[in-house]
């Protein structure tokens, strides 16, 4: 009778982590940045039907890189959690921190379970506050850990290189146009350092805008508004975007 093949727990977990990281790295990168009036989500996404960014609740947004079917299940679960908690208690009781804890428990349980493969996803949960100091951004890797981020964060693809680029250039108080242009510049850098062009139609952009009078702060930026933000300069573009939003 042959001896059963033994794999140490440490090696098994390392193999699962490597498997998940490789799956996430195959996806396209996305970035989340704070700007003066909120938080902006930017990613390269040629599909108009499958979104990387979504609204979870009034002030909370969701971003994900990796396998679409896996993070879509997590997104739907997050929406249900937020709706139930807001209905049972109060809308103010729905927070990004609470949602991040729920996602962390789910991802951690799946990652440590030998009965199923780990999720090939990396999540970002963001909440816009009344002031920039109240903004919250949490990154959740495949193993269910929670990383509290400030300023900017990148996930998927060559996230490490993009994060380094953003850390050197991102500043507090940037306008939406400035933050968007910085995000596109970061996403346009290939692993060898060369710059490529990403057309506007391949970009997915959304914001959590604290200045919106509506209770729900999440808004997608598309079409002419996106073109103006990419082409024009800060103050003029911000005024045009605000006026366009009021007209909608």
Swiss-Prot record:
Which pathway features in its UniProt record? Protein degradation; proteasomal Pup-dependent pathway
Task: List where in the cell it is found.
Answer: Cytoplasm
Annotated region (Disordered) at: 229-248
Gene Ontology MF terms: threonine-type endopeptidase activity
The regulatory note on its activity is: The formation of the proteasomal ATPase ARC-20S proteasome complex, likely via the docking of the C-termini of ARC into the intersubunit pockets in the alpha-rings, may trigger opening of the gate for substrate entry. Interconversion between the open-gate and close-gate conformations leads to a dynamic regulation of the 20S proteasome proteolysis activity.
* Cytoplasm found in the keyword field: yes
Kindly state which keywords UniProt assigns to this record, in alphabetical order: Cytoplasm, Proteasome
The cellular component terms of Gene Ontology attached to this UniProt record, alphabetical and capped at eight, are: cytoplasm; proteasome core complex, alpha-subunit complex
Gene3D superfamilies hit by this protein: Glutamine Phosphoribosylpyrophosphate, subunit 1, domain 1
Q: Name one GO biological process term.
A: modification-dependent protein catabolic process
What protein family is recorded? Answer: Belongs to the peptidase T1A family.
How does the record describe its quaternary structure?
A: The 20S proteasome core is composed of 14 alpha and 14 beta subunits that assemble into four stacked heptameric rings, resulting in a barrel-shaped structure. The two inner rings, each composed of seven catalytic beta subunits, are sandwiched by two outer rings, each composed of seven alpha subunits. The catalytic chamber with the active sites is on the inside of the barrel. Has a gated structure, the ends of the cylinder being occluded by the N-termini of the alpha-subunits. Is capped by the proteasome-associated ATPase, ARC.
Q: What function is annotated for this protein?
A: Component of the proteasome core, a large protease complex with broad specificity involved in protein degradation.
Specify the protein name.
Proteasome subunit alpha
Lineage at the top is: Bacteria, Bacillati, Actinomycetota, Actinomycetes, Kitasatosporales
What gene is this protein a product of? prcA
